[in-house]
């Protein structure tokens, strides 16, 4: 783990958090990440998304993690979605792993992933699932950290420029307490 990165969970939404989260999201989309948004992504749309996610976190439906560099600048985020059907209380979903392009390949994604896994165990969730663009940076990150591939779905989503892309579904079984 990168010692110059601090991971914290979003406890209370501050105006600066919304702006910083929006900047990371926009940077990722402008860099070509297929993360549910199309180009161009406005600040207003990005901020509205983060307000919805913060409200969901306040209801206990998800935990939003923030990664800050040594200067206190937000450089990444990920979500642990706990709101699952009642017959799946052992499961959670990992969503929106976003790392600003200037902070990639510095251990930020790995630190966020580690925080998500610890929080999942604390919430008694032993099965994590996610999907990511086949072959992208996230795909390699999850593969390196023990996640198992279930399969690929061709033409699942769109790149921000409108082209189709495939997704790969991953899971990770965590040790039960």
Region annotations inferred by a language model:
Residues 2-3, 10-13, 148, 159-177:
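Terminal substrate-recognition subdomain of acyl/acetyltransferases
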Residues 12-96, 100-102, 113-115, 119, ...:
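Acetyl-CoA-dependent GNAT
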Residues 98, 134-136:
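Active-site-proximal loop/turn and secondary-structure-junction residues that shape catalytic pockets
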Residues 106, 110:
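Residues forming the Rossmann-fold NAD(P)(H) cofactor-binding site
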Residues 112, 136-138:
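Conserved short alpha-helix immediately C-terminal to the canonical SAM/SAH-binding motif I
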Residues 113, 120-132:
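Conserved GNAT acetyl-CoA-binding A-motif
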Residues 127-132, 143, 148-164:
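Conserved catalytic-core motifs of GNAT/GCN5-like acyltransferases
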């Amino acid at each position: 783990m990168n010692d110059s990165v601090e991971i914290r969970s979003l406890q209370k939404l501050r105006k600066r958090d919304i702006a910083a989260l929006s900047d990371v999201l926009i940077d990722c989309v402008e860099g070509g990440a297929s993360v549910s948004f199309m180009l161009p992504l406005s600040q207003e749309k990005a901020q509205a998304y983060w307000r919805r996610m913060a409200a969901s976190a306040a209801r206990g439906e998800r935990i939003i993690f923030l990664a800050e560099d040594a200067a206190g600048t937000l450089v990444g985020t990920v979500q642990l979605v706990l709101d699952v059907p009642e017959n799946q209380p052992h499961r959670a979903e990992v969503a929106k792993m976003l790392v600003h392009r200037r902070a990639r390949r510095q251990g930020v994604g790995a630190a966020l992933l580690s925080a998500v896994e610890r929080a999942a165990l604390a919430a008694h969730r032993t099965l994590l699932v996610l999907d990511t663009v086949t072959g992208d940076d996230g795909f390699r990150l999850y593969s390196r950290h023990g996640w198992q591939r279930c399969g690929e779905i061709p033409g699942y989503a769109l790149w921000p420029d409108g082209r189709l892309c495939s997704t790969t579904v991953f899971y990770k079984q965590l040790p039960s307490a």
